[in-house]
Amino acid sequence: MAKPTRKRRVKKNIESGIAHIHATFNNTIVMITDVHGNALAWSSAGALGFKGSRKSTPFAAQMAAEAAAKSAQEHGLKTVEVTVKGPGSGRESAIRALAAAGLEVTSIRDVTPVPHNGARPPKRRRV
């Protein structure tokens, strides 16, 4: 049988891009794209090995943002616009981690979808 060949990652030279931070109550996903929306790098708290309730911590979001930034910098990325979506606890720490990783943050946009009284929300938790 033929040996499976691994697809070689092509190095793109892209100066600026968009960092999409999706912060839910259970996880934080950081995806870095070029200005047209084509993915360069992504990472999440779960993909880094955090399990269960540890995925939803600000530290896990920070680690996910650092991993995505490091991977995107290999493509020559220097500046990012940040879009944040969701109510999760990892919003602020992910933005700080992107800046600390050496990416210049030019703007921060909150694109959390707000319903115009759509579907009924889940019932209140009683702890």
Swiss-Prot record:
Record keywords: Ribonucleoprotein, Ribosomal protein, RNA-binding, rRNA-binding
InterPro entries tied to this protein: Ribosomal_uS11, Ribosomal_uS11_bac-type, Ribosomal_uS11_CS, Ribosomal_uS11_sf
Disulphide-bridged cysteine pairs: none
Biological processes per GO annotation: translation
Keyword check for Repressor: no
Pfam family of the protein (one): Ribosomal_S11
A single GO molecular function term of this UniProt record: rRNA binding
GO CC aspect terms: ribonucleoprotein complex; ribosome
Gene3D superfamilies (UniProt xref): Ribosomal protein S11
Cross-referenced NCBIfam families: PRK05309.1, uS11_bact
HAMAP family cross-referenced by the UniProt entry: Ribosomal_uS11
Family that this chain belongs to: Belongs to the universal ribosomal protein uS11 family.
Role, per record: Located on the platform of the 30S subunit, it bridges several disparate RNA helices of the 16S rRNA. Forms part of the Shine-Dalgarno cleft in the 70S ribosome.
Protein name: Small ribosomal subunit protein uS11
